[in-house]
């Protein structure tokens, strides 16, 4: 099992839609999107007999491709209400982020870091998509979106220490997240670095034991 097997799930339609083909509206249908997402999971099922380093690469790449496919669906009008089922629903990136966080948190840091800037970019793309969804759904206080904010915080925290230093993708993501990170996060989460132009402060608050820190941007 290697990345070539994973990318075998990517067909010509995927490439054409990704490149912005004039036929993308016709190619990007709900059945195609569902089958593409299913194929990515099916191809990546046999991960037990490989090294951890390879498994991490394949697993994160799979989630990254899930996000790319979902974004193609969004750009072609295939997003449905979050309450519905299917990989085209609005909150699907939260599910992808949950799996990505699980992969990254369980990984040996050296194995994760060994994939270099490519790994950072994939994590950044997933986190950026998650931030977009959370902005669109900023008024939603359901557990799903609360968890989404927690996953975003965890992904940004991971990017703050990749390869022993802050990733180049971190501060643009923190700036993009904006007020999302003012919302409740679990006790004990570390504070994130402020974005460029930050003039506020990071302070601890006590939200009935549920909140530890929040970012405050100057207005």
PLM region spans:
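Fungal C-terminal regulatory tails
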Residues: 9-23, 36-57, 70, 77-219
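Aromatic (Trp/Tyr) and acidic
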Residues: 4
């Amino acid at each position: 099992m290697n990345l070539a097997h994973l990318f075998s799930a990517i067909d010509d339609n995927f490439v054409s839609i990704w490149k912005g083909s004039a036929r993308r509206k016709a190619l990007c249908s709900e059945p195609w999107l569902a089958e593409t997402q299913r194929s990515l999971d099916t191809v990546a099922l046999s991960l037990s007999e490989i090294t951890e380093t390879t498994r991490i690469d394949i697993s994160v790449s799979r989630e990254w491709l899930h996000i790319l496919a979902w974004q193609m669906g969004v750009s072609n009008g295939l997003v449905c209400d979050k309450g519905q089922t299917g990989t085209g629903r609005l909150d699907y990136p939260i599910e992808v982020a949950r799996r990505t966080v699980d992969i990254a948190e369980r990984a040996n840091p050296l194995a994760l870091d060994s994939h270099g800037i490519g790994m950072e970019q994939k994590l950044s793309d997933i986190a950026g998509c998650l931030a977009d969804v959370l902005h669109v759904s900023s008024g939603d206080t359901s557990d799903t979106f609360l968890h989404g904010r927690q996953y975003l915080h965890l992904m940004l925290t991971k990017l703050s220490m990749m390869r022993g230093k802050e990733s180049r993708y971190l501060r643009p993501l923190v700036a993009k997240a904006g007020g999302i990170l003012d919302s409740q996060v679990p006790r004990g989460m570390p504070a994130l670095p402020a974005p460029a132009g930050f003039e506020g402060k990071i302070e601890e608050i006590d939200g009935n034991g549920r909140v530890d820190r929040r970012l405050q941007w100057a207005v």
